[in-house]
UniProtKB/Swiss-Prot annotation:
Domain of life: Bacteria
Pfam families in alphabetical order: Copper-bind
Classification of source organism: Bacteria, Bacillati, Cyanobacteriota, Cyanophyceae, Synechococcales
Membrane topology classification: Peripheral membrane protein
Protein name, entry field: Plastocyanin
Organism of origin: Synechococcus elongatus (strain ATCC 33912 / PCC 7942 / FACHB-805) (Anacystis nidulans R2)
Domain Plastocyanin-like: 35-125
Primary site of residence: membrane
Amino acid sequence: MKVLASFARRLSLFAVAAVLCVGSFFLSAAPASAQTVAIKMGADNGMLAFEPSTIEIQAGDTVQWVNNKLAPHNVVVEGQPELSHKDLAFSPGETFEATFSEPGTYTYYCEPHRGAGMVGKIVVQ
């Protein structure tokens, strides 16, 4: 009987130690840092499109739009003037950025080329 009680006590101590070790691992894990995701304005094949046209990011991430082809381009985020960049980018490699803090789905477009289908979507988790 003493052997069984001793075994049960050791098993419970081991279980408590395991829970503490695993729990401390999760508490000490570093939070994910914010990322920057690039979107090309003007597809590599010369089409008037954002590349990629749809992205998924986390709240706090930054989107960087890079002027790629067939300038001029800009970015207007529907209903979000603070995230928009209405000035036209003329030079290849010219960039502008916006940080998305709130979860949601954001539709954006290039003002001069919206009619040609230059529209994109950002899904913020």
